[in-house]
């Protein structure tokens, strides 16, 4: 059986026609799934009995089961652990803002990139998620909170560009007016910096925001923090970023997790300013998430602000990320790992 969420409307139409069914039934089915959030074919009232049976025999609506749901004390952040049909568990985070609800979705079960500050990579990657499985996190979360989600961040467990085919199909699906109709400009994809895939993504001409996990302006330190830096130098990464900017005319966000005594000095800030000066970019400074498997400590707020001021003085737009959901282990990989290791 196949997950119907992996299908575009046109693909489902073609399948129905091949079974001597009416093509317009595809739109009716999509309406039940994506607008009414009905995930059982038998509850789709305007679908004929024969067609329901045909669909039930060949497809399932692959929305994951909620195995854990946590809400922060301020009620602005929800953390979900979702279980798929094969028993694999991933996590998603919903953040409520004045401008709408945003979800951080996972693209893989685990991750193989090995970034030292990330809990989701500690056990490696188990498998890729399909386009429909990524999409289903949004649908399951919408059903749970009873509100529409309008912004998507691909920044949960997994490296999106390590699952390129499924992630790009997800982007095509989620932005379609036949499914969730989320605008491309409301989507951010975060990558540790797989250079060839950044260029390939640029060639797709999406209007999404690309976020690069940078974390150091120096190759030696970046190699220590992020194994991907052993494959691609900062020079190569910046060339790929320039290609992306020139191709899409979209501003890139550079993410920089500040670790006390590691990458938070004024010297590092000045070096980063040199690397990024003149680029169409924005820097998001992040207090690092502390995990017991490494000795990384958060930089002080004073250091973070001083670091940011250096960047601003050099004409680089900079913000400090607001911490949300710390009381519910909302940072990437933390809750899933504590759950599956029980």
From Swiss-Prot:
GO MF annotation list? 4 iron, 4 sulfur cluster binding; metal ion binding; rRNA (adenine(2503)-C2-)-methyltransferase activity; rRNA binding; tRNA (adenine(37)-C2)-methyltransferase activity; tRNA binding
For the protein in the UniProt heading, the enzyme class is transferase
| A GO cellular component annotation in the UniProt record | cytoplasm
Q: What is its EC number?
A: 2.1.1.192
Positions contributing to [4Fe-4S] cluster binding = 111, 115, 118
- The region annotated as signal peptide is none
What's the name of the protein? Probable dual-specificity RNA methyltransferase RlmN
